Amino acid sequence: VEVATVKNCGKKLLATPR
């Protein structure tokens, strides 16, 4: 469960334009 959360956060950060 924790791993999935981390992956989701990373994907959101990558998808979000800086």
Curated annotation (Swiss-Prot):
| Record GO cellular component, one term | extracellular region
Per UniProt, the keywords (alphabetical) are:
Disulfide bond, Isomerase, Secreted
Q: What does this gene product do?
A: Acts cofactor-independently.
Spell out the subcellular localization from the entry: Secreted
Q: How does it assemble?
A: Heterodimer with venom peptide isomerase heavy chain; disulfide-linked.
What's one GO MF term for it? isomerase activity
Organism expressing this protein natively: Agelenopsis aperta
Protein's UniProt name: Venom peptide isomerase light chain
Where expressed (tissues)? Expressed by the venom gland.
